[in-house]
């Protein structure tokens, strides 16, 4: 008999949930508050009250064996000797409007628990009690119903009978998928050099994950050069392993939309190579981009009275899902939008619901790693998941940002102003918090007086003195790690700051619930979100964080900065069976394993598949691009770029460590060589602007084009200009992050951890940007191109040791004349 695992809550909500999506404010931290209230009620329930009772049972319906699992809030025996299942719900519904029929799902959930418990305990009758806790008034309303064991079992049987067609659909699909994946062939005539090795590493990791310790699963880091075909090399073996029972679902997670498109293309290639392939894939798109009915400002307005796609969503979603599941199996943003319009449902929520029925889920890193927006339906507990983490070199900085938070004192002042005249508990709380932040601002300004020194970010990395200073008398700052120019860094978070903000939380929440139509609602809602972010970060705060306070005029900015995301990334990856993290630049591997919480993971580095003679690699070590030498370096850099561009007609890119330096060199270059066409990256570009820039780099150019871009920016990685669309690039400088106090905190932290502070904070991230930029050249075995390195530090051992093996033929040249000769020799061969 076929069997299927089915969480009880999923069963009930899928069948019985009705109504609309309604994102109006109702307390966005109700999950945590609800858990606290559950514990509170369970604690006072009495000695015989069993809390959080796990229930599991095998139940047959329509020829399917359902494995049902769930957790009853409480089980107790009442004064009449009747065993009672207690289902606790928190609600913002006014107390007088709480009725027995408030939500049929609540009764159904309790009744399913009761059916299982009565069957297993041999009880002829059972009671189900709904306990509603009104969070605004702390009032409790209880309803109790008596059921016979026969009634409960009949009810459960009816639910499973209703669900059986959906279960059978999934079982049939699983069988088709397994058979289809077993027959899946690599979609190209042959593997590129290195592809088979990468595929083997991913396959072995997925296979090992089947029997791995569920506390972490198996993990592998794979560095594979650009052009090897990493997307297919990771996706294909993971699907083969999944077809062998080594995973129920595959999550392909990326840092950028362009990489998501590559994953979609790889799935499409597999389908075209094997017609009839049974594989469902969905791409999750941010709500703002997926929304079909934004408000006047372009934001989603998820209210039933405003959005027709939100109104009645849960009444129509099963029809929309059925239509999709009967279709092609490829669910892109466009496909979801088409179905959403057809059935008048929200495409964003439809994508989330559809993901439960799909084999491959493609999306951003945040769907796994972000503590706020991660997919709770999958990752709140460990599951049989496979993770493919693309462009994993981006994950450390992204993860740090996800676990950090910031708050500005001015948001308190502006909130008070928005409330207008009159007294209220919210105004009182805002005033008190504002006073605490005012005292902290004064203490910060006194501890770190402004000196008018050189702006942060415009120096080279050197040892910054971290000197403690005296705090203001009315706010005791802990001993600073750093204090300069209005900015203080602290290891210890001053408890008074999060405490003052927490005191605002409840009255603000009450105000938002009671004043949904107030003109200030949107502004105060933003304040609420900021308070939530700070509260979450404060709850996580430990030795992996530092506190930054910055005083500017009347403003005080509070930042809780995650320096080391390792434990949080580790916990997220532990939700799955296996994880393969891959990129063209994971050098050195120990650095990435350590900062991503995978110190014991296997790491492999694959050689370049391309002939080394196809890459001309040259360096002019006579040029220094350090900040204090940049102005003097401009003529030499411009001369080197001219030599590069004149070496052969074609398209080139020059990458710079900052936009200001780029502008300096560009102006000098354009003035001296106006006959060479140029293109300059603008400071801010949207997707259309990016596409327009890249479109200038066409195939078979009749004239030379030199593009000026920022290293580490949108053109420094994820750009695939094959053939003669790009035949050379210059990399100006070693890519070190700009010096600022935050970067120095990273240096300090990792110096204490491993003695490698400069490497972890500066050298390794910088070299990553260099290698990514260089990887834009030579994308296929037939390509031929040049990489020119401009900086004396490329000749120093500490930097040169980070070069990949296929860079061993680098030529260090004494000047521009030698470069011209070397380029001629390269292009003539």
Predicted regions and their residues:
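A contiguous, basic/glycine-rich beta-loop/short-helix subdomain that forms a polymer-engagement track
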Residues: 336-361, 371-378, 507-624, 632-634, ...
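Conserved helicase motor "Helicase C" RecA-like lobe of SF1/SF2 P-loop NTPases
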Residues: 657-682
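A substrate-engagement module of RecA-like helicase motors
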Residues: 178, 185, 214-215, 246-361, ...
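Conserved pre-motif I regulatory segment
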Residues: 173-223
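Signature of the SF2 helicase/ATPase Hel1-core->accessory helical subdomain module
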Residues: 234, 261, 341-360, 365-499, ...
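Mg2+/Mn2+-dependent nuclease catalytic core
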Residues: 57-154
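Conserved RecA-like P-loop NTPase helicase motor core
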Residues: 621-632, 683-794
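Metal-dependent nuclease catalytic cores that hydrolyze phosphodiester bonds in DNA/RNA
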Residues: 1-78, 82
